[in-house]
Amino acid sequence: MTPHINAPAGAFADVVLMPGDPLRAKYIAETFLENAQEVTNVRNMLGYTGTYKGRKISVMGHGMGIPSCSIYAKELITEYGVKKIIRVGSCGAVNMDVKIRDVIIGLGACTDSKVNRIRFKDNDFAAIADFGMARAAVQAAKNKGIDVKVGNLFSADLFYTPDLEMFDVMEKYGILGVEMEAAGIYGVAAEFKAKALTICTVSDHIRTHEQTSAEERQLTFNEMIEIALESVLLEDSL
């Protein structure tokens, strides 16, 4: 047990899917996993373990922002032996080549947060996904006939940013989506010798102001979860 996770030793699988919303974790467990059992509920940050096509997998919420997700990712890795984390969440698009409802596989994550500079002696740290996990996710999407975008995300510290000109810079540099956690999770994974990947669905477009409905978000969310789960099986088979 930790100050933030009250699961017993051995409660988590070696692979954990992590949405921001703990109720999304509950939904994933109830919809996609067999024999799912709740294993932690401190602060209502729900976590579950079950099986997917016979493969033991866990799912747990990580909250909003790099500080929150970093706490849970670190404790899962160092205290529960988790080897791989797949963040599954939503993002906003700033590039006109990216459309709402697109699924993005985040190979890397830029950020305006200082967390990785703090851990990397004030130098730039290349916060990147594990190649094998990313490759398996791309293949899983192809197998299911789901088009995905692959590239860089931007993990913002502020949801309500006053610096709107930064969106122009992001677009210039080909950023596919803006979210709030990937760079932190990639940094934690690197520091503690684990592996991580972020998969996002585009829920809104910052340029066009388009937004998905609740029903549309659910559909694309399901596709993202299917990609994540199938990628675990694919990588196991390699």
From Swiss-Prot:
A single BP term in Gene Ontology: purine nucleoside catabolic process
One example GO MF annotation: purine-nucleoside phosphorylase activity
InterPro entries: DeoD-type, Nucleoside_phosphorylase_CS, Nucleoside_phosphorylase_d, Nucleoside_phosphorylase_sf
Domain of life: Bacteria
Protein family membership: Belongs to the PNP/UDP phosphorylase family.
A Pfam family per the record: PNP_UDP_1
Keyword rRNA processing set for record: no
Principal EC category: transferase
PANTHER family assigned to the protein according to its UniProt record, in alphabetical order: PURINE NUCLEOSIDE PHOSPHORYLASE DEOD-TYPE, URIDINE PHOSPHORYLASE
Matching PROSITE patterns: PNP_UDP_1 (PS01232)
Protein name: Purine nucleoside phosphorylase DeoD-type
Residue(s) at site: Important for catalytic activity: 217
Keyword set, alphabetical order: Glycosyltransferase, Transferase
Keyword Nuclease: no
Binding site for phosphate: 20, 24, 43, 87-90
Stated role: Catalyzes the reversible phosphorolytic breakdown of the N-glycosidic bond in the beta-(deoxy)ribonucleoside molecules, with the formation of the corresponding free purine bases and pentose-1-phosphate.
Catalytic reactions on record: a purine D-ribonucleoside + phosphate = a purine nucleobase + alpha-D-ribose 1-phosphate; a purine 2'-deoxy-D-ribonucleoside + phosphate = a purine nucleobase + 2-deoxy-alpha-D-ribose 1-phosphate
EC number: 2.4.2.1
Residues that hold a purine D-ribonucleoside according to the record: 4, 179-181, 203-204
NCBIfam families, alphabetized: deoD, PRK05819.1, PRK13374.1
Description of how the protein assembles with itself and partners: Homohexamer; trimer of homodimers.
Active site location: 204
GO cellular component: cytosol
